[in-house]
């Protein structure tokens, strides 16, 4: 395979993990970061100890503080940043891009102020003439396991399947299997909203409830995700795939999941400010819960689990009381509630 340069915007765990994959595939990954300490560590020690402790990076993984240097000559630009930084980074990228480029984003969330998905934010900020294609790379994955080269599957979603196939070709190897899909909306809705349900799974575990409770929460949570997704144009089949149920399972059941860990602390009685301070990293489900709270009301979508998690996060609702209220809701036929 011909070596290709790929720029990765974001020196966090996911950006670094994807850079490792590209280096394993004999490509030229360049990470753009904004902290001297992390950029220097990647270049000099071939580690990123804050985000991926105990992982040795291939020497082919390079990092820079210069956005221009990172994207110069890149076939693909991967945007691997927290959702709250998406607009400001895309404004910078729009100024820096000199020619149409394939853009890939791996950020899972909804913008609270606008209810826009991340691809819509990118389209808002980056001129169409500079976007060769926009691909969503998503699925059941923790960066830590990708960096350890454990078997993982993802889905590259794009309206232009030929662009999705290019991304598939650059990242696929014996450890990372990539599928393609044309349902961008479904991939983004599944990836964003599962973080809310993962907060709920953590809360359930923190309260000491068992597997039955978590299985119910995940299943009914997927019903809520599907309802909203279909209402905004997703293919319902997408939610049975990697970017739907797959991503939900891994995020609700793993100690690697920031959202599960945050929820677990909430379930044990800590308040949101304490939890976020202890986490020291972005917990996307908190921001997404705020966005979806208003969005679901606007669309008149019934999302009782999501609303309960919002109330625990932002209205000081007692978690046990929230569970009691959910369990006491009116009787329903299951198939009519999807």
Swiss-Prot record:
Subcellular location: Cytoplasm
GO CC terms: cytosol
GO aspect biological process, one term: glycerol-3-phosphate biosynthetic process
EC number(s) from the headed UniProt entry: 1.1.1.94
Superkingdom of the organism of origin: Bacteria
UniProt: sn-glycerol 3-phosphate binding residues: 108, 139, 141, 194, 247, 257-259
Matches recorded under InterPro entries: 6-PGluconate_DH-like_C_sf, 6PGD_dom2, G3P_DH_NAD-dep, G3P_DH_NAD-dep_C, G3P_DH_NAD-dep_N, NAD(P)-bd_dom_sf
Keywords from the UniProt entry: Cytoplasm, Lipid biosynthesis, Lipid metabolism, NAD, NADP, Nucleotide-binding, Oxidoreductase, Phospholipid biosynthesis, Phospholipid metabolism
Top-tier EC class: oxidoreductase
Residue numbers annotated as active site: 194
Annotated GO MF terms: glycerol-3-phosphate dehydrogenase [NAD(P)+] activity; NAD binding
Pathway listed: Membrane lipid metabolism; glycerophospholipid metabolism
Catalytic activity: sn-glycerol 3-phosphate + NAD(+) = dihydroxyacetone phosphate + NADH + H(+); sn-glycerol 3-phosphate + NADP(+) = dihydroxyacetone phosphate + NADPH + H(+)
Binding site residues for NADPH: 13-14, 108, 143, 258, 282, 284
PANTHER family hit by this protein: GLYCEROL-3-PHOSPHATE DEHYDROGENASE (PTHR11728), GLYCEROL-3-PHOSPHATE DEHYDROGENASE [NAD(+)] 2, CHLOROPLASTIC (PTHR11728:SF1)
Protein family per UniProt: Belongs to the NAD-dependent glycerol-3-phosphate dehydrogenase family.
Physiological role: Catalyzes the reduction of the glycolytic intermediate dihydroxyacetone phosphate (DHAP) to sn-glycerol 3-phosphate (G3P), the key precursor for phospholipid synthesis.
NCBIfam families linked to this entry: PRK00094.1-2, PRK00094.1-3, PRK00094.1-4
Full protein name: Glycerol-3-phosphate dehydrogenase [NAD(P)+]
Gene name, Swiss-Prot/TrEMBL: gpsA
């Amino acid at each position: 395979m011909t070596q290709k340069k790929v720029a990765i915007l974001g020196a966090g765990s996911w950006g670094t993990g994807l850079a490792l994959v590209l280096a394993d595939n004999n490509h030229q990954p360049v990470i753009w970061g904004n902290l001297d300490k992390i950029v220097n560590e990647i270049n000099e020690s071939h580690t990123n100890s804050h985000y991926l402790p105990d992982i040795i990076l291939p020497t082919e993984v390079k990092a820079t503080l210069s956005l221009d240097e990172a994207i110069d000559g890149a076939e693909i630009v991967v945007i691997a940043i927290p959702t709250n930084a998406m607009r400001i980074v895309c404004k910078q990228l729009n100024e820096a891009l000199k020619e149409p480029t394939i853009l890939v984003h791996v950020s899972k969330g909804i913008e609270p102020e606008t209810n826009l998905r991340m691809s819509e934010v990118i389209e808002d900020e980056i001129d169409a003439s500079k976007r060769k294609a926009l691909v969503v790379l998503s699925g059941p994955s923790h960066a830590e396991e990708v960096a350890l080269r454990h078997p993982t599957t993802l889905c590259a979603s794009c309206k232009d399947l030929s662009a999705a196939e290019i991304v598939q070709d650059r990242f696929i190897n014996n450890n990372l299997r990539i599928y393609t899909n044309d349902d961008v909306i479904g991939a983004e809705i599944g990836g964003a909203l599962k973080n809310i349900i993962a907060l709920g799974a953590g809360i359930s575990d923190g309260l000491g409830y068992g597997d039955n409770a978590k299985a119910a929460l995940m299943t009914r949570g997927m019903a809520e995700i599907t309802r909203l997704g279909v209402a905004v144009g997703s293919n319902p089949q997408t939610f049975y795939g990697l970017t739907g149920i797959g991503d939900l399972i891994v995020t609700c059941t793993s100690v690697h999941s920031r959202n599960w860990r945050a929820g677990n602390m909430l379930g044990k009685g800590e308040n949101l400010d304490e939890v976020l301070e202890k986490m020291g990293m972005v917990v996307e489900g908190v921001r997404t819960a705020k966005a979806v709270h208003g969005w679901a009301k606007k669309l008149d979508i019934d999302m009782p689990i999501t609303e309960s998690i919002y109330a625990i996060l932002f209205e000081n609702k007692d978690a046990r009381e929230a569970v009691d209220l959910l369990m006491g809701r009116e009787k329903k036929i299951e198939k009519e509630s999807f």
